[in-house]
Amino acid sequence: MNDVTEPVSATLAERAKRTLGKRNLVFIGLMGAGKSAIGRLTAQALGVPFVDSDHEIERVSRMTVSDLFATYGEEEFRALEARVLKRLLRSGPRVVSTGGGAYINERSRRHIKKGGLTIWLNAELDVLWERVNKRDTRPLLKTENPKQTLENLMRARYPIYAEADLTVLSRDVKKEAMVEEVLAAVADHQKA
C-alpha cells in the first residue's frame, strides 16, 4: 500500500536518483525520527528497494531487537548490526533505514559512510517523545525516566549524527512533505 497521498515530484525523484547513482541512501537518527516510514516512502519515490536494518537483523537472528539486547547485551547486538550493515551496503542503489545506535558504533559508521549517502532525520525531543512513548519495544528506554534517557541520547548522539552528508528536520508534517525535502536534499547534494 502506498502511504503517499499526494504524488511526489517525478522530476525531483529523477534528479535525486541521478545524484545517488549506484550509492545507497542511508537514513540515520534517533528512534522515532521517522527513518523507516520516510525511508520506505523515499524508496518508493526513487523506484529502488527499501531495507530496514533492524528488520534484517531480526530476520537473520530469528530474535527481536529487544530480545537480542536482553539476551546478548548491547555490545553483541552492535557487532551483529555492523555485520548486517556491511552486507546490506555492498550493492545499491537502495534505501536503508538504520537503528538509532548504528551510526554511533564506529565500525557501523565506517560501513555506512563507505556504502552510501547519509541523511540524518533530526528531530526535537518533544517530537521524538510523542512518537516513542506509546510503545514498549525500545530497549534503551526501559528506564525509570525514559524521556530523560531520550534527552541524554540526543546529547550524546546528535554531535555524531551531525557528521551525516545531509540533514533534514523531522517534524509533524505530512509524510510526503518530508519525502519531498529528502529528495530535494539528495538532488542538490554535490557528489564527493
Swiss-Prot record:
Keywords: Amino-acid biosynthesis, Aromatic amino acid biosynthesis, ATP-binding, Cytoplasm, Kinase, Magnesium, Metal-binding, Nucleotide-binding, Transferase. ATP binds at G32, A33, G34, K35, S36, A37, R138. Monomer. It comes from Rhizobium meliloti (strain 1021). It holds the Pfam family SKI. Its EC number is 2.7.1.71. The keyword Lipoprotein does not apply. Its cofactor is Mg(2+). GO terms for molecular function: ATP binding; magnesium ion binding; shikimate kinase activity. GO terms for biological process: amino acid biosynthetic process; aromatic amino acid family biosynthetic process; chorismate biosynthetic process. Binds 1 Mg(2+) ion per subunit. This is Shikimate kinase. InterPro entries: P-loop_NTPase, Shikimate/glucono_kinase, Shikimate_kinase/TSH1. Mg(2+) binds at S36. Pathway: Metabolic intermediate biosynthesis; chorismate biosynthesis; chorismate from D-erythrose 4-phosphate and phosphoenolpyruvate: step 5/7. SUPFAM superfamilies: P-loop containing nucleoside triphosphate hydrolases. One of its GO terms (cellular component) is cytosol. It is found in: Cytoplasm. Catalyzes the specific phosphorylation of the 3-hydroxyl group of shikimic acid using ATP as a cosubstrate.
